[in-house]
């Protein structure tokens, strides 16, 4: 039998104890992860190919069949599949913030998946990798591994008065819809009335338990993703960095 000696500290000793800082939530966690990814991107940036935003984030470019934001083997597979390579063309929401330095500089349009912080690029690096479908991953995701993998697809759901709404899904594998999050602050806010139009809304959700603030319905993307999956009799999941406990809490709050 093992005995543990009880230790009693006096008031002076307690004052000397280093108390760890509280875990930051929301934007603090997102900013910390964004800074880490930007630092890694800077270490890998190539002169004349990769660029910087005004916020010191790296925007990678392609050169000689390679791309700074993708593993070479994944990038080759993406370029070989038109249905995958189309995802690379989505224009970055910031387009281009930097101005050309001189008349001779060529200005390229920034794409969303060029950004070092792109969750979609990370998703494609994982699922476009050869022989990714190990037995463990198939079991984890509940797929056979032979399903078609689609990126940036539109999933339809029925609205009132016979209308149809489409939601962009980051990835679809068979009946599984996947939303990817990396450095995004949250799952966005949206008007409650927009999801109330879905014919399945009251069948799926207890509206009294959804959080509505002055900004609108919290975790709007999650609610729409679930409704899209329900409409196709499918499943819905979120992939995020394990340190994003704020996103995990949002998921649990909605589910």
Give a label for each model feature:
Residues 147-174, 180, 184-190, 214-215:
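Active-site metal-binding core of divalent-cation-utilizing nuclease and nuclease-like domains
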């Amino acid at each position: 039998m093992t005995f543990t000696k009880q230790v009693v500290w006096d008031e002076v000793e307690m004052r000397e104890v280093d108390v760890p800082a509280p875990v930051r939530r929301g934007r603090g966690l997102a900013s910390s992860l964004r800074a880490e990814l930007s630092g890694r991107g800077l270490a890998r940036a190539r002169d004349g190919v990769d660029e910087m935003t005004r916020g010191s984030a790296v925007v990678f470019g392609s050169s000689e069949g390679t791309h700074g934001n993708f593993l070479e083997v994944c990038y080759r597979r993406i370029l070989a599949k038109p249905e995958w390579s189309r995802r690379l063309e989505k224009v970055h929401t910031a387009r281009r913030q930097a101005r050309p330095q001189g008349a001779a500089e060529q200005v390229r349009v920034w794409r969303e998946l060029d950004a070092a912080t792109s969750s979609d690029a990370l998703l494609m690096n994982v699922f476009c990798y050869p022989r990714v479908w190990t037995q463990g991953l198939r079991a984890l995701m509940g797929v056979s591994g032979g399903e078609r993998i689609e990126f940036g697809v539109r999933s339809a759901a029925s609205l009132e008065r016979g209308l149809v709404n489409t939601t962009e899904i980051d990835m679809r594998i068979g009946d599984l819809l996947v939303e990817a999050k990396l450095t995004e602050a949250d799952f966005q806010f949206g008007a409650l009335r927009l999801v109330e139009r879905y014919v399945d809304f009251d069948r799926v959700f207890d509206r009294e338990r959804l959080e509505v603030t002055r900004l609108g319905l919290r975790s709007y993307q999650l609610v729409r993703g679930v409704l899209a999956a329900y409409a196709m009799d499918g499943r819905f999941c979120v992939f995020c960095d394990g340190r994003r406990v704020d996103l995990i809490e949002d998921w649990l709050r909605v589910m």
